[in-house]
Regions:
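Structural motif
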Residues: 5-7, 67
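Structural/interface elements that position substrates and couple domains in central-metabolism enzymes
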Residues: 6, 15, 26-28, 37
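Auxiliary Fe-S-binding modules of radical SAM enzymes
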Residues: 21-23, 48-65, 70-161
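Short, flexible active-site loops
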Residues: 33-42, 62-69
């Protein structure tokens, strides 16, 4: 299995064509957080550019994946809006995990999300049409990538995690 996690490349089609031409099984670009928090959490990234990057890759036939860190101060409505935005961009795989502050210089944790809330988000993501959603406190970007690949290939896959 070939999984590539990429930067947004400023949504430049010629660069995204190069990535897509390599035909990885899954191309990942993480949106990381909700639109409102993007300027504070991702100082060099733009929410719209990330969505455009994912959309351009999906249009090229790539199986796209994105991830969100939760616990930064986002509301339920903002999480659901972000999931809707990702689906509209053609994203098929999504991961949701708890943000953990790596150092005191990084953005602070606003909330620790319960496993029950992660499960509710997973159910909502699947209802929106994502082929695979991993959603739990310790989920990270490439979490169970093999299961995600099986899900997008319509193979039997356990998507509970």
């Amino acid at each position: 299995m070939l999984f590539r996690s990429i930067p947004d490349f400023d949504a430049r089609p010629e660069l995204l064509d190069t990535v897509a031409a390599a035909k990885p099984d899954i191309i990942g670009h993480n949106i990381e957080t909700v639109e409102r928090l993007t300027p504070q959490v991702r100082s060099r990234a733009r929410y719209a550019t990330s969505l455009r990057t994912l959309e351009l890759l999906a249009r090229r036939g790539a199986a796209t994946k994105s991830g969100l860190m939760l616990g930064l101060g986002e509301s339920d409505d903002e999480v659901l809006q972000t999931l809707h935005d990702l689906r509209r961009a053609g994203v098929r795989i999504v991961t949701l995990g708890q943000y953990l502050r790596p150092t005191l210089e990084h953005y602070p944790v606003a909330e620790y999300i319960t496993p029950e809330k992660f499960e509710a988000y997973r159910q909502q993501a699947l209802a929106m049409g994502f082929d695979y959603c991993a959603s739990a406190p310790m989920v990270r970007s490439s979490y169970r990538a093999q299961e995600a690949l099986a899900a997008i290939k319509n193979e039997k896959s356990e998507t509970r995690h």
